């Protein structure tokens, strides 16, 4: 390579970088990335303390990365390039057959998975109300055959055996989902189960409580969206897959929803359709995360009051359970601080079910409040 040509390439590269810098300076800062589903770093304030402790330069680096021109397109191009050279794991998410993204489950390292089982056991000791434990295996276990050859993911079935050692009645979500593993029971671009998966999960719960199962032919699914790109889509950088279809199965007629989002009861909604025009479409189920929510059904088939101590999987599960129970109470320990045993006693609860996806259960530090 001649010196003249080398200088030419250097000049072109410098012009390219300079152009990007000018472009970035001229562009208005974005507050969030809908593709990545997260808030972006804003321009940091220059202060003496931030310079001295080094945080200013760290914030500047994060700011430049987040506000880089065409960031969403670059991250997608990076993932596509890595796929072409044989990579199958993107930000701890596997690209699997059938345009499916599956989150790898890492082995717990801090003992929280054992501690959380202990907190559940302590709650059972504090309450005289019948209590059940339901841990939902993720797609990495149920769809293990879809993972790339040699792909690793923590053994969730072994953990279910460990959980059974508590002696509590177990809701066998694993058997219910595995029996229908050839069906779309999980979203391809999100970690949650679909309405179909939640339907099978509801019947697993009703079975262990000795209640009649729901009939699939009793529901007429409504296609709520054909453009759902979930959290795995956002986190992986794999932005070329066909979007998921989201369905609503349960009719809203006859159901009354009450939410406690700010500490006081307010009218809720079974399906908040405003989210269907946004990135986080799964939040349309019950309106997303909230400390406490109660679904009432005067025409429930069997009656009774059920308390779900739960994560977001129950947002899609609860509408089905409301077909059997007169009241379904959903308590999220991340946001609600009344001791669950006290809440159950004060509200005339007939049965308590701790329902979590396994990846959430083994990492949630808020389950300590179950032992209060």
Give short role names for the model-derived ranges.
Residues 1-372:
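Extracellular glycan-modifying ectodomains
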């Amino acid at each position: 390579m001649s010196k003249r040509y080398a200088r030419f390439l250097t000049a072109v590269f410098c012009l390219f970088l300079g152009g990007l810098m000018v472009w970035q300076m001229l562009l208005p800062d974005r507050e969030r990335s809908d593709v990545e589903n997260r808030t972006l770093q804003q321009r940091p304030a220059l202060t003496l303390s931030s310079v001295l402790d080094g945080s200013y330069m760290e914030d500047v680096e994060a700011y430049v990365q987040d506000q880089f021109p065409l960031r969403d397109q670059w991250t997608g191009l990076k993932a596509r390039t890595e796929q072409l050279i044989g990579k199958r794991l993107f930000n701890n998410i596997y690209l699997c057959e059938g345009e499916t993204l599956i989150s790898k489950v890492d082995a717990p390292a801090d003992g929280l998975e054992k501690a959380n089982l202990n907190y559940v056991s302590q709650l059972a000791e504090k309450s005289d109300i019948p209590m059940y434990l339901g841990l939902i295996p993720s797609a990495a276990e149920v769809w293990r055959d879809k993972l790339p050859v040699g792909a690793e993911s923590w053994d969730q079935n072994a953990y279910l055996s460990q959980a059974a050692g508590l002696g509590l009645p177990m809701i066998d979500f694993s058997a219910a989902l595995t029996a229908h593993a050839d069906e779309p029971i999980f979203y391809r671009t999100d970690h949650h189960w679909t309405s179909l998966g939640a339907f099978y999960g509801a019947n697993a719960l009703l079975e262990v409580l000795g209640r009649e199962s729901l009939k699939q032919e009793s529901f007429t699914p409504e296609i709520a969206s054909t453009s759902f790109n979930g959290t795995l889509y956002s986190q992986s950088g794999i932005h070329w897959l066909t979007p998921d279809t989201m369905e609503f199965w349960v009719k809203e007629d006859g159901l009354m929803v009450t939410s406690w989002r700010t500490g006081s009861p307010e009218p809720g909604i079974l399906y908040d359709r405003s989210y269907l025009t946004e990135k986080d479409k799964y939040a349309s189920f019950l309106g997303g995360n909230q400390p406490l929510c109660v679904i009432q059904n005067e025409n429930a088939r069997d009656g009774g009051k059920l308390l779900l101590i739960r994560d977001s999987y129950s947002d899609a599960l609860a509408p089905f359970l409301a077909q059997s129970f007169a009241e379904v109470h959903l308590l999220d320990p991340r946001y609600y601080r009344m001791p669950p045993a006290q809440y159950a006693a004060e509200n005339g609860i007939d049965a308590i079910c701790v329902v979590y996806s396994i990846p959430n259960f083994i990492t949630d530090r808020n389950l300590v409040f179950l032992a209060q």
